[in-house]
C-alpha cells in the first residue's frame, strides 16, 4: 500500500499529540462519560470513581419525536442515528419539517443495489488479466451506496443487518474470489431491509454466500455406512446468532433464571442435530462448466437436489417435521417454528438498537421495540401506521427504535448510560457525507481497499473476521468505567493500543485532503498495478476529496470554525473544555493572512482531525 500523505510536521505533531490526549482522556468533556474509550497501557492514571447510577426511567414512557426536526442540531442528531451521516443541505432542508414524514418517505425509496454495480466492474476486467477490480467490487458498491445513495435509511438498515446475519469475504478464500456471492447477499439484505425478518431469514438461507460461509452448501443426508452426518454449522448459528440466542429471555431482553438463579438454556445438541437435517440438499443451481467458470450461479438462490435431502424426521425446539419432507417445505416449517419463539423479538430488537442508538439499552426500551417487532406495527408520532401487522416487520421495528422516547429525549445527551461509541466505519462515512467527498468512482480510493486492520479502522464492510462480527453484542469492556457498571459496549472490543492511533492516522489522512495531496505518479502506478485499468487522472485526484469551501471561509476564525464543525459533525455535543482545547491548538497553527490558502487548508484539516478524535465526538448520543 502507498505511503500516505503526511501534513506538515508541526501540524502532524500537534494533531497526533492532542488527538491522542483527547481520545484517551477518558472523560474529556460532556461526551465521555461511562462509554468513553479505555486508556491504553501507555497512559498511567488512576481511574476516576464511577458516578452514581441515574434513577430508572418511568415504566413504559410514551414514544415521542417531539422536536426531532425542530432544530438543526436535533435534525443532525436524528440523521446521525438513522443514516450514514447528515449533510448540511439535508439538515437545512429538513429542519422544521416532520421526522415522521421523512421516515415514511424513506420507506418508499427504491433500493440502491450492488449487483448491477459489480457487473460493471466485472466488465472492466481485462482479458487474461487480474480480476481485482471485480474482486473489490463489493467494497466499491458499498462506499457508493453508503455515501451517495439516496435511500439512506435502507442502506443503514442493511448494514446493521449485515452485522447480525454475518457473511464475510475476509481471508482471501472463495467469497473473496467470487464477489458475486457477497454482492448478491448485500442485495438480499438491502431488499429485505424494510420487509419481514421471517422472509429475510428464508432469503438468507437460500443465498449461496451464506451456504458457502456456514458450510451447508452441498450438505448431504446422513450415511449410516460411512458415519457421515449433516453439517450442523448453519443450524447452530441460525439459533445462536440469528434468531433466539442460547438462553431464555424475558420480553425486555433480560435472562430468565431458574429456581437456582441460573440462566435457562434453550436447546441441546440434539436440537441442533435435528435442525441440521433441514438444511440438506441445497446447492448452487448449476455447476461449473468444463472450463471451470461459474456462470451466474452465485447470483441466484440455491436449489434442492433431492438425492441429498435427509429423509429422517427433524425434531428441534419442540417442533417436529415428518420424515420424507422435501427441503423447501422443511425450511418453511423450521423457520416458522423458530420465528414463533418468544426470544426472537427481544434478541433481535436489542441488537438493532445497539446498531442505531445505544449500546446498553434500558430493558424498557428493549421491551417497547420488541413489542413493535412482535406486533409488526408501529404508529409514528404523526399517527401514520408503519408495518404490515405480521410479527417480524422490520420497518415497524426500526421506527420503534428511532422514535422511542429514550432515543429522542434531550436528557439522553447528558445521560452517561445512554449512547454508543461510534463505529469506525460510520465515522468515515459521516466525514465523507458531511464534506461532500467524491464517491462516484470508489475504485480510485486505493487506501480504502481493506480497512479491517487496526492500523486503519478495524472494520470493513462485509469483512468481519468471523460469523461473530467485528464485536460481540454482549461485550463488556474490562478495565473501563462502563465495564465497572456492567454496561455492554460492543464497539470497545475493537478499541486498543493499536486501533486508537490507527484511526487517528487514518482520519488525518483524509481530513488533510487524502489522495489530492499525494504523489500522482505513485498513486497512478498503484492503481494500475492493483486494478489493471487505465488511470483517469481527474478521477484519481478527486476520489474521496472533501469540499471544504464552508470551512475555509471560517479558517481565519478558529472559534467560529470549531463551532461550525461542532454543529456539523457532533450536533453541538462538544463540551466547552473540548472546544477550548481545539481552538488553542488551531491558534498554534498560524495563518499569515487572508491569502494564505495553504495555512487555511492546514488549519481546517487539523480542526476536522481534532474534532473527529475527541471523546465528545466518539461517543454518539
List where the protein language model places each region.
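A Lys/Arg-rich helix-loop hairpin that forms a DNA/phosphate-binding surface
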Residues: 173-179
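Bacterial N-terminal signal peptides that target proteins for export
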Residues: 2-16
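Alpha-helical bundle segments that constitute or directly flank the non-heme di-iron/ferroxidase center
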Residues: 82, 152-159, 347
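Structured, charged N-terminal subsegments at the starts of enzyme catalytic cores
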Residues: 129, 137, 141-152, 159
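Short, contiguous, well-structured surface segments enriched in hydrophobic/aromatic residues
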Residues: 151-154, 165-170
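His/Asp/Glu-rich metal/cofactor-coordinating catalytic motifs and the adjacent surface-exposed loops
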Residues: 61-130, 134-140, 179-349, 353-621
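Bacterial Sec-dependent N-terminal signal peptides
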Residues: 18, 22-64
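Substrate-binding cleft and catalytic face of glycoside hydrolase catalytic domains
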Residues: 118-119, 157-162
Amino acid at each position: 500500500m502507498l505511503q500516505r500523505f503526511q501534513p506538515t510536521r508541526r501540524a502532524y505533531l500537534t494533531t497526533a499529540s492532542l488527538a491522542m490526549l483527547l481520545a484517551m482522556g477518558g472523560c474529556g468533556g460532556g461526551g465521555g462519560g461511562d462509554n468513553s474509550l479505555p486508556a491504553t497501557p501507555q497512559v498511567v492514571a488512576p481511574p476516576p470513581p464511577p458516578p452514581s447510577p441515574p434513577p430508572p426511567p418511568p415504566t413504559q414512557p410514551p414514544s415521542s419525536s417531539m422536536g426531532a426536526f425542530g432544530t438543526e442540531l436535533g435534525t443532525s442528531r436524528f440523521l446521525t442515528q438513522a443514516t450514514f451521516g447528515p449533510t448540511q443541505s439535508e439538515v437545512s432542508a429538513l429542519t422544521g419539517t416532520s421526522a415522521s414524514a421523512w421516515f415514511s418517505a424513506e420507506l418508499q425509496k427504491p433500493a440502491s443495489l450492488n449487483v448491477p454495480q459489480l457487473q460493471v466492474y466485472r466488465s472492466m476486467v481485462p482479458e487474461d488479466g487480474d480480476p481485482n477490480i471485480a474482486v473489490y467490487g463489493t467494497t466499491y458498491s458499498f462506499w457508493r451506496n453508503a455515501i451517495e445513495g439516496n435511500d439512506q435509511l435502507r442502506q443503514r438498515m442493511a448494514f446493521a443487518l449485515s452485522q447480525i446475519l454475518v457473511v464475510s469475504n475476509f481471508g482471501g478464500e472463495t467469497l473473496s474470489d467470487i464477489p458475486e456471492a457477497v454482492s448478491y447477499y448485500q442485495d438480499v439484505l438491502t431488499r429485505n431491509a424494510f420487509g419481514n425478518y421471517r422472509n429475510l431469514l428464508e432469503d438468507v438461507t437460500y443465498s449461496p454466500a451464506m451456504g458457502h460461509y456456514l458450510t451447508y452448501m452441498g450438505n448431504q443426508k446422513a450415511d449410516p455406512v460411512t458415519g457421515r452426518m449433516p453439517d450442523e454449522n448453519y443450524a447452530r448459528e441460525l439459533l445462536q446468532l440469528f434468531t433466539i440466542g442460547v438462553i431464555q429471555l424475558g420480553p425486555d431482553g433480560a435472562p430468565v433464571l431458574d429456581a437456582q438463579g441460573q440462566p435457562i438454556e434453550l436447546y441441546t445438541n440434539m436440537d441442533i442435530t435435528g435442525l441440521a437435517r433441514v438444511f440438506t440438499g441445497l446447492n448452487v443451481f448449476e455447476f461449473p462448466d468444463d472450463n471451470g467458470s461459474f456462470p451466474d450461479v452465485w447470483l441466484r438462490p440455491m436449489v434442492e437436489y433431492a438425492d441429498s435431502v435427509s429423509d429422517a424426521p427433524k425434531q428441534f425446539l419442540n417442533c417436529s417435521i415428518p420424515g420424507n419432507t422435501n427441503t423447501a417445505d422443511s425450511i418453511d416449517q423450521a423457520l416458522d417454528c423458530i420465528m414463533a419463539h418468544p426470544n426472537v423479538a427481544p434478541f433481535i430488537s436489542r441488537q438493532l438498537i445497539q446498531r442505531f442508538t445505544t449500546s446498553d439499552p434500558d430493558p424498557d426500551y428493549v421491551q417497547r421495540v420488541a413489542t413493535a417487532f412482535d406486533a409488526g406495527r408501529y404508529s409514528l408520532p404523526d399517527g401514520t401506521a408503519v408495518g404490515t401487522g405480521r410479527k417480524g416487520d422490520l420497518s415497524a421495528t426500526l421506527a420503534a427504535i428511532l422514535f422511542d422516547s429514550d432515543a429522542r429525549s434531550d436528557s439522553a445527551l447528558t445521560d452517561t448510560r445512554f449512547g454508543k461509541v461510534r463505529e469506525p466505519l460510520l465515522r468515515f462515512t459521516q466525514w465523507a457525507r458531511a464534506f461532500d467527498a467524491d464517491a462516484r468512482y470508489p475504485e480510485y480510493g486505493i487506501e480504502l481497499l481493506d480497512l479491517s486492520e487496526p492500523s486503519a479502522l478495524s472494520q470493513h464492510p462485509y469483512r468481519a473476521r468471523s460469523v461473530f462480527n467485528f464485536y460481540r453484542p454482549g461485550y463488556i469492556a474490562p478495565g473501563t468505567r462502563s465495564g465497572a457498571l456492567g454496561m455492554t459496549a460492543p464497539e470497545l472490543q475493537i478499541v486498543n493500543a493499536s486501533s486508537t492511533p490507527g484511526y487517528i492516522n487514518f482520519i488525518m489522512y483524509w481530513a488533510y485532503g487524502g489522495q489530492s495531496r499525494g504523489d500522482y505518479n505513485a498513486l497512478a502506478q498503484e492503481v494500475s498495478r492493483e486494478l489493471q485499468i487505465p488511470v483517469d487522472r481527474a478521477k484519481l485526484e478527486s476520489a474521496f476529496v472533501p469540499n471544504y469551501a464552508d470551512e475555509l471561509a471560517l479558517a481565519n476564525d478558529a472559534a467560529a470554525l470549531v463551532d461550525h464543525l461542532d454543529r456539523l459533525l457532533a450536533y453541538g455535543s462538544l463540551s466547552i473544555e473540548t472546544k477550548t482545547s481545539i481552538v488553542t491548538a488551531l491558534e498554534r497553527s498560524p495563518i499569515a493572512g487572508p491569502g494564505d490558502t495553504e495555512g487555511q487548508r492546514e488549519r481546517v484539516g487539523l480542526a476536522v482531525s481534532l474534532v473527529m478524535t475527541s471523546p465528545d465526538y466518539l461517543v454518539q448520543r
